[in-house]
């Protein structure tokens, strides 16, 4: 497995992640950069995009999805609640091809992603863990958490979601890769993030 960190377009510079499996299949976590940036990275790796996994439906995480789906025919996964229409940039049903598996596990080649439903920033937000990594979208940030004042947001649900993440059976060394800003570890967030224990709500 190889993973590349690719920034989305200005001014939000969303963190997106392109994973190349041993079989040269590309898995994209969120899609906020120009489509050509991802296609170039895939070409340089000799890989084909097969899956896009979306942490939630806000425009700054899905901007390249339609173009990439058209170019590659890849599968696109999003929680059905957010799939009803992403904020400011609706994605039509023909683009959003798949819901998360009923058992909340998705295996692609040698990788198995565990899906955690974490509403709060949006009603359909998810976090994904795989191979010692936690892709936390706009739920958990380094030292903070996602906003809850957008349509579909909820402080109460965010508090529950952050408590869920704090109690996950994942080691402290798990690397937290959020949708914006810098990276962290789950142990660091458990011990220092004031939003992780629910006391703020």
Spans of features found by a protein language model:
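Short Gly/Pro-enriched turn/cap motifs at secondary-structure boundaries
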Residues: 7-9, 97, 117-119
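Metallo-beta-lactamase
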Residues: 91, 117, 122-201
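Active-site HxH/HxHxD metal-binding segment of metal-dependent hydrolases
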Residues: 11, 33-111, 194-195
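Conserved beta-strand hairpin/beta-sheet module of binuclear metal-dependent hydrolase folds
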Residues: 1-45, 127-137
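Core dinuclear metal-dependent hydrolase active-site scaffold
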Residues: 18, 104-129
């Amino acid at each position: 497995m190889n993973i590349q960190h690719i920034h989305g377009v200005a001014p939000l510079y969303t963190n997106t992640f392109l994973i190349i499996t041993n079989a040269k299949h590309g898995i994209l976590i969120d899609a906020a950069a120009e489509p050509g940036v991802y296609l170039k990275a895939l070409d340089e790796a000799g890989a084909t995009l097969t899956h896009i996994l979306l942490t939630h439906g806000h425009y700054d995480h899905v901007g390249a999805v339609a173009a990439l789906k058209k170019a590659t025919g890849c599968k696109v996964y999003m929680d059905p609640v957010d799939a009803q229409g992403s904020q400011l940039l609706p994605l039509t049903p023909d683009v959003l091809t798949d819901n998360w598996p009923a058992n909340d596990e998705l295996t692609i080649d040698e990788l198995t992603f565990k899906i955690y439903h974490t509403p709060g920033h949006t009603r359909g937000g998810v976090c994904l863990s795989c191979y010692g990594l936690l892709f936390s979208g706009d739920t958990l940030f380094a030292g903070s958490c996602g906003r809850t004042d957008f349509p579909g947001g909820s402080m109460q649900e965010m508090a529950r979601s952050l408590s869920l993440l704090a109690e996950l059976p994942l080691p402290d060394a798990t690397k937290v890769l959020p949708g914006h800003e810098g990276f962290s570890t789950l142990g660091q967030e458990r011990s220092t993030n004031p939003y992780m224990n629910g006391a703020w709500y």
